[in-house]
């Protein structure tokens, strides 16, 4: 039985996703000590990867990392942020996302990331409201203190926004606050080092479980004290995770046309 030909239906131009999404100037960006943005090399910005460095670092190395990731990730723009606070007692380009040390250079037992969390959420609002990104197309990768910030941003965002973010990857991050709200559906990959597997139902992950209904844990072999960055094949779990959520828009999507089924 022959089928009738499909008709192309134009999409309302005001609702078509932009092909390119430049980073527009905003006071939200000025809350950070620096940032670098690089659009997708293909000219099609379908995914935005925000990279947050660790304690005492700066964003230059993560910008290089992001550019390398762009060679593999489809239609992905990158934005690296540099933490707003200088690390005390150190000379040079060393930054922290929130106060981490007391006056004796000892680590704080109860740090307060509230100010920087609010700054990142304000930036996300700018990216969604002014730059054309949907929240579901924004992915955050954090390492160390940057991973902790990413997890805290997830909690704050979920309290005030109904749309989930694209994903969160936490490398050695931890929660400072303890989520009490209903879980977000934002997918979260948390990577940790340990000599043994720590079950998902362990009390260690109670805050992680409360923060999202889509939690994935991945253990790297090693000592828990080893909080070094991923190396070589240790990236495999991250790339596999991202492959489930990063978009790759096809030609008819970019032309603002759809082909109805039936």
Curated annotation (Swiss-Prot):
Keywords: Hydrolase. It is an enzyme of class 3 (hydrolase). Gene3D superfamilies: alpha/beta hydrolase. GO terms for molecular function: carboxylic ester hydrolase activity; palmitoyl-(protein) hydrolase activity. GO terms for cellular component: cytoplasm. Pfam families: Abhydrolase_2. Belongs to the AB hydrolase superfamily. AB hydrolase 2 family. This is Uncharacterized hydrolase UM10204. It comes from Mycosarcoma maydis (Corn smut fungus).
């Amino acid at each position: 039985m022959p089928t009738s030909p499909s008709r192309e239906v134009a999409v309302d131009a005001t609702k078509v996703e932009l092909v390119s999404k430049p980073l527009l100037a905003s006071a939200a960006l000025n809350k950070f000590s620096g940032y670098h943005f690089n659009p997708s090399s293909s000219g099609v910005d379908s995914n935005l990867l925000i990279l947050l460095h660790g304690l005492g670092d700066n964003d230059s190395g993560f910008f290089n990392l992001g550019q390398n990731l762009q060679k593999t990730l489809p239609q992905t723009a990158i934005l690296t942020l540099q933490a707003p606070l200088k690390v005390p007692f150190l000379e040079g380009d060393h930054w922290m996302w929130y106060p981490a040390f007391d006056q004796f250079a000892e680590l704080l037992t109860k740090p307060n990331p509230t100010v920087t969390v609010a700054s990142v959420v304000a930036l996300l609002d700018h990216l969604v409201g002014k730059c054309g990104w949907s929240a579901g197309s924004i992915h955050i990768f954090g390492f160390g203190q940057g991973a902790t910030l990413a997890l805290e941003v997830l909690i704050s965002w979920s309290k005030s926004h109904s749309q989930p973010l694209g994903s969160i990857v936490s490398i050695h991050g931890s929660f400072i606050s303890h989520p009490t709200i209903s879980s977000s559906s934002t997918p979260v990959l948390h990577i940790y080092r340990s000599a043994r597997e720590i079950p998902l139902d362990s009390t260690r992950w109670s805050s992680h479980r409360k923060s999202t209904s889509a939690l994935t844990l991945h253990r790297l072999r090693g000592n828990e004290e080893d909080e070094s960055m991923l190396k070589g094949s240790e990236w495999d779990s991250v790339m596999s995770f991202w492959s489930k959520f990063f978009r790759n828009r096809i030609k008819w999507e970019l032309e603002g046309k759809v082909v109805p089924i039936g």
